[in-house]
Amino acid sequence: MAGETFEFQAEITQLMSLIINTVYSNKEIFLRELISNASDALDKIRYQALSDPKQLETEPDLFIRITPKPEEKVLEIRDSGIGMTKAELINNLGTIAKSGTKAFMEALSAGADVSMIGQFGVGFYSLFLVADRVQVISKNNEDEQYIWESNAGGSFTVTLDEVNERIGRGTVLRLFLKDDQLEYLEEKRIKEVIKRHSEFVAYPIQLLVTKEVEKEVPIPEEEKKDEEKKDEDDKKPKLEEVDEEEEEKKPKTKKVKEEVQELEELNKTKPLWTRNPSDITQEEYNAFYKSISNDWEDPLYVKHFSVEGQLEFRAILFIPKRAPFDLFESKKKKNNIKLYVRRVFITDEAEDLIPEWLSFVKGVVDSEDLPLNLSREMLQQNKIMKVIRKNIVKKLIEAFNEIAEDSEQFDKFYSAFAKNIKLGVHEDTQNRAALAKLLRYNSTKSVDELTSLTDYVTRMPEHQKNIYYITGESLKAVEKSPFLDALKAKNFEVLFLTDPIDEYAFTQLKEFEGKTLVDITKDFELEETDEEKAEREKEIKEYEPLTKALKDILGDQVEKVVVSYKLLDAPAAIRTGQFGWSANMERIMKAQALRDSSMSSYMSSKKTFEISPKSPIIKELKKRVDEGGAQDKTVKDLTNLLFETALLTSGFSLEEPTSFASRINRLISLGLNIDEDEETETAPEASTEAPVEEVPADTEMEEVD
């Protein structure tokens, strides 16, 4: 019967071309990927059979079987899993690209290891590392048996199978190996790869092996006569006499060697989580981790534990060395924990088993108490699941603290998963305080190394009541912030928060060990002595005419203008109210494509324009205003320039950058002694433009010390 031909999705064609032409040496990982897929197919049929046992009647045994066929240069990998319908063969293997296809190709182009392929969900195509043609024979309980075939070109065929033996249920992958990859037909090589990568797969992996055995066979009549003749000719005395009648009755046989084929199970190891942790080597943990995670690296940390009492379950949880490429993608699978009930795999999609902020953790959980016939809906409402989840989170926080005891290990962990910890601080009310101890930041006293909140508290001077922090786009931006001056002068440490998620986390955290967390870009009370307080009150009165004049000039751009005791070197800064967005949060929210604009206008705090009475610029500006120059164009220009500069140094963006640029250009002209009238005269072609308003000589902008 002629098959139907289909075009591969373009990205899949590119991917196969990349793989088939790769010079990557460690090609053995193809077997790991195909066995992993087979194991997934077996998981699915076993789960279906929990609610409908008849599903297993088409093939009662659950297995993965490898059959080398050296004479044909073919390697067959069969599983008795769920199988694929015709539509699934077309969609899953060719016409619908998975989200990881493009991401994997980009990673490869960037120099990533091809053994990462499984993490991107495209492990099937790894077979083209060793084969240049493949047939997939598949039988699902809901459909006929079909053959899917491809030689990694631009198309594939799907044909109703009328030539191969019936497989009952499941899938056979028939790989036609390249001439330089025939080592994967050798028994020794296959066993080596299985031991390295797939020893802990939950289903028996059978290898069809050829063995030489000795058998006793009856001696043919002609050989018997020759034997008798030889006995007669033999003149040597016999050591013992045998009853002649007995000898007559005994059939004459001989031993011959012959080759037989038999199935040998390659993974007889019992489930790792059922064994005592003290009996398991790190190598075994590493091998098990790789078999369940598709990772090619060893894990960073392992947490193996059991909970007994009213509730019983065992778990092995792994913390990877790196974050996956799609860690925070919304469509990504939210859980990497396989749930078993009394050694029977139930699901790896129990999203309620672990909170989203811990979605990077991989492992297995085996419960003694959950019912076997759990549906997804029942999982969500099950009280036992909630208790298991609570225990898992508790044990993982324990593991993170154990990692923190080794600073080098913790640096690796934190660089990969800091965002997850911060997300946990934001979302997990119950464990917020424990997670806060894991947070690390640069600060004014720890610029080059990260410091913990606990260490910050131990360094606090006696008279310091709060924990201070500043938010911003980058370390460089916050290190030079004018907001730091007064706190540095008092020897108060300030934490640098430069990750967008930091501000969300701190907004929820609010305090640490009884100390309030204070954002210094917002309005706050700074600890001051009685002398400082008296001096501040005096300055407020002295500068009242200036603050009023500046407010009149700036109008609705600011809520108020105040004399600041929190600024030293900088002439001015913009601070926001305690309950609105900071400059940094305003920047983050502006970048949100789907933000609520009404919420933005409500949360964008009214700005307070703070001026420093210690700044020579502010002193000179005060002098000008006191002399009656509040309406002076220079004063207005300088005020606007001062305000816009303060916006930038305080982390805001300018609403009208062109006005700011014009003011700067006028300053440049003055600095270069360029008369604006002269400029216009030397550019007659620009005469059609509106004339520039002449500034009276007595109000010219002056250079201020």
Swiss-Prot record:
GO CC annotation terms, alphabetical: cytoplasm; cytosol; mitochondrion; perinuclear region of cytoplasm; plasma membrane; protein-containing complex
Any one GO MF annotation of this record: ATP hydrolysis activity
Induction remarks: Expressed constitutively at a high level and is moderately induced by high temperatures dependent on transcription factor HSF1.
Sequence repeat start-end pairs: 221-225, 226-230, 232-236, 246-250
Biased composition (Basic and acidic residues): 219-240
Chain spans, region Disordered: 219-257, 675-705
PROSITE patterns attached to this UniProt entry: HSP90
Residues the record lists as binding ATP: N37, D79, K98, F124, R376
Motif stretch (TPR repeat-binding): 701-705
Pfam families per record: HATPase_c_3 (PF13589), HSP90 (PF00183)
Residues modified as Phosphoserine: S653
Stretches for region 4 X 5 AA repeats of [DE]-[DE]-[DE]-K-K: 221-259
Keywords: ATP-binding, Chaperone, Coiled coil, Cytoplasm, Mitochondrion, Nucleotide-binding, Phosphoprotein, Repeat, Stress response
InterPro entries (UniProt xref): HATPase_C_sf, Heat_shock_protein_90_CS, HSP90_C, Hsp90_fam, Hsp90_N, Ribosomal_Su5_D2-typ_SF
Bias (Acidic residues) ranges: 691-705
GO biological process, one term: proteasome assembly
Compartment annotation: Cytoplasm; Mitochondrion
Free-text function comment from the UniProt entry: Molecular chaperone that promotes the maturation, structural maintenance and proper regulation of specific target proteins involved in cell cycle control and signal transduction such as CNA2. Undergoes a functional cycle that is linked to its ATPase activity. Interacts dynamically with various co-chaperones that modulate its substrate recognition, ATPase cycle and chaperone function. Required for growth at high temperatures.
Entry's free-text remark on domains: The TPR repeat-binding motif mediates interaction with TPR repeat-containing proteins.
Subunit field text: Interacts with the co-chaperone SGT1. Interacts directly with the substrate CNA2. Interacts with NAP1.
Alphabetized PANTHER family for the sequence: HEAT SHOCK PROTEIN 90 FAMILY MEMBER
Family statement drawn from the similarity comment of this UniProt entry: Belongs to the heat shock protein 90 family.
Note: Present with 132053 molecules/cell in log phase SD medium.
Protein name per its UniProtKB record: ATP-dependent molecular chaperone HSC82
Gene name, Swiss-Prot/TrEMBL: HSC82
